[in-house]
């Protein structure tokens, strides 16, 4: 019985627009990633090859907000763009998991 009450309380706190907002934030992350890739003077195909990805279209999916940078290759992605992995991951966390970002770094941190 207690468990059901806990689940009910949790369900009441879920954001109603989680999916559309999430897609919008992924698109903003993708725009940022596209700018960083352009700064590094890499095409989508170049970056995909350097990351060992089979299809360059995955880069397009990420940049257009349809997918996220996988955690397993986040460090390599940062390095290929000439960025430090920790700040890169932190910046993406702000888009991919805004509530987790707020809990870890505070609302004012960017």
Name each model feature, range by range:
Residues 3, 79, 87-110:
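Short, charged recognition helix plus adjacent turn
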Residues 30-50, 76, 108:
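Short basic helix-loop element that most often maps to the first helix and adjoining turn
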Residues 36, 50, 61-62, 91:
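Residues in the recognition helix of alpha-helical DNA-binding motifs
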Residues 45, 56-57, 86:
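Key DNA-contact positions within bacterial/archaeal DNA-binding proteins
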Residues 52-69:
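Recognition helix of helix-turn-helix/homeodomain-like DNA-binding domains
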Residues 65-79:
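Short, basic-rich loop-to-helix N-cap that marks the start of a DNA-contacting helix
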């Amino acid at each position: 019985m207690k468990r059901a009450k806990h689940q009910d309380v949790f369900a009441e706190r879920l954001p109603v627009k989680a999916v559309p907002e999430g897609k919008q934030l992924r698109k903003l992350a993708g725009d940022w990633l596209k700018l960083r890739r352009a700064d590094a003077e890499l095409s989508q195909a170049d970056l995909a090859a350097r990351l060992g990805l089979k299809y360059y279209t995955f880069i397009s999916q990420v940049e257009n907000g349809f997918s996220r940078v996988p955690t397993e290759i986040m460090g390599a992605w940062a390095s290929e763009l000439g960025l430090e992995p920790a700040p890169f991951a932190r910046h993406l966390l702000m888009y991919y998991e805004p509530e987790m970002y707020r809990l870890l770094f505070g609302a004012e941190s960017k």
